[in-house]
């Protein structure tokens, strides 16, 4: 591997850490209903953990309600159990044709908890970015040790890796701040 491909690989892996953070954030409940809220919930469907979206239609008729319409009658109770078991604090209402989830307004305490979770996810993303930096720097040092890279080039490449890291850590902070603001807005 040469210096360029190490830097490109590091950038790609840092992008993936940010994408994972965005997925985690999409599952965090704000005050509004969103289909992505139930995306992470798996239903034990015939012994296989299956995403709700693969066993039912998920719709958001208004900002305070999610409706789930299972394609299989047997899935009603399974979906209901899966939603209750999730840590989202949602209460499904099953009327036999459709499952409704009314999204109650968040309490101040719940908002603070969600803010903490958002910060935790952001911190995990930063750790992932820093781990990528460490791996890239180790690969660069191996190149230098094998005389494939001069000391000056090593220093320059490490500076580039640090700039990448700083950029992605700043991006993480920016996304975390936006998510916290969204959670705290009533």
From Swiss-Prot:
Spans traversing the lipid bilayer: none
One Gene Ontology MF term: ribosomal large subunit binding
Gene3D superfamilies in alphabetical order: 3.30.1360.40, Ribosome-recycling factor (1.10.132.20)
A Pfam family of this chain: RRF
GO cellular component labels: cytosol
A biological-process GO annotation: cytoplasmic translational termination
Record's keyword terms, sorted: Cytoplasm, Protein biosynthesis
Keyword hit for Cytoplasm: yes
Top-level taxonomic group: Bacteria
The keyword Protein biosynthesis belongs to this UniProt entry's keyword annotation: yes
Intracellular or extracellular location(s): Cytoplasm
Function text: Responsible for the release of ribosomes from messenger RNA at the termination of protein biosynthesis. May increase the efficiency of translation by recycling ribosomes from one round of translation to another.
Family stated for the protein in its record: Belongs to the RRF family.
Protein name: Ribosome-recycling factor
Provenance organism: Nitratidesulfovibrio vulgaris (strain DP4) (Desulfovibrio vulgaris)
Lineage per the UniProt record: Bacteria, Pseudomonadati, Thermodesulfobacteriota, Desulfovibrionia, Desulfovibrionales
Gene: frr
């Amino acid at each position: 591997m040469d210096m360029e491909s190490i830097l490109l690989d590091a950038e790609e892996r840092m992008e993936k850490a940010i994408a994972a953070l965005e997925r985690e954030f999409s599952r965090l409940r704000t005050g509004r209903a969103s289909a992505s809220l139930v995306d992470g919930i798996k239903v034990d469907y015939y012994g296989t953990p299956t995403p709700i979206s693969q066993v039912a239609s998920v719709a958001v008729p208004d900002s305070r309600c999610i409706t789930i319409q299972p394609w299989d009658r047997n899935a009603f109770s399974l979906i209901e159990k899966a939603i209750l078991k999730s840590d989202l604090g949602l209460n499904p209402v099953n009327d036999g044709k459709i499952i409704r989830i009314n999204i109650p307004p968040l309490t101040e305490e719940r908002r603070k908890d969600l803010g903490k979770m958002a910060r935790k996810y952001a911190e995990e993303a930063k750790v992932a970015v820093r781990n990528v930096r460490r791996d890239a720097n180790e690969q660069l040092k191996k190149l230098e040790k094998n005389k494939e890279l001069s000391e000056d080039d090593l220093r320059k490449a490490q500076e580039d890796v640090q700039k990448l890291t700083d950029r992605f850590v700043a991006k993480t902070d920016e996304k975390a701040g936006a998510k916290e603001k969204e959670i705290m807005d009533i």
